[in-house]
Amino acid sequence: MKKSYRVKKEKDFKALFDAGHSVANRKFVVYCLDRNLPHFRVGLSVSKRLGNAVTRNRVKRRLRHALMDMSSQLENQDFVVIARKGVEDLSYQDIYSNLVHVLKIAKLYKD
């Protein structure tokens, strides 16, 4: 995923948490904020409660891969995906389907 597609700065995360709205399902929480950008930007948050660094990095890699696979269907907004406990045990297909579900609730996923 290119750097231009990532939310990296603390002020951007803070703006998303303060001014954005949130939706959730059992595996993910998504905060989103509409900005006039030519493409989406995403930030990922995986807590230490999910496991050691290897486990957390595996979850982040799978999330990035799923987001790039669905990039043509995503709205041009900033959003942060927060992984909840239990996502570390899911397969890629389960992560993908749960992510699509929560993004549809947030109205970030176009069919």
Curated annotation (Swiss-Prot):
Protein name: Ribonuclease P protein component
EC numbers for this chain: 3.1.26.5
Subunit structure, as described in the record: Consists of a catalytic RNA component (M1 or rnpB) and a protein subunit.
Function recorded in the entry: RNaseP catalyzes the removal of the 5'-leader sequence from pre-tRNA to produce the mature 5'-terminus. It can also cleave other RNA substrates such as 4.5S RNA. The protein component plays an auxiliary but essential role in vivo by binding to the 5'-leader sequence and broadening the substrate specificity of the ribozyme.
Keywords: Endonuclease, Hydrolase, Nuclease, RNA-binding, tRNA processing
Organism: Streptococcus thermophilus (strain ATCC BAA-491 / LMD-9)
Similarity remark: Belongs to the RnpA family.
GO biological process: tRNA 5'-leader removal
Stored SUPFAM superfamilies: Ribosomal protein S5 domain 2-like
Cellular component annotations (GO), alphabetically ordered: ribonuclease P complex
Catalysed transformations (reactions): Endonucleolytic cleavage of RNA, removing 5'-extranucleotides from tRNA precursor
Broad enzyme group: hydrolase
Domain of life: Bacteria
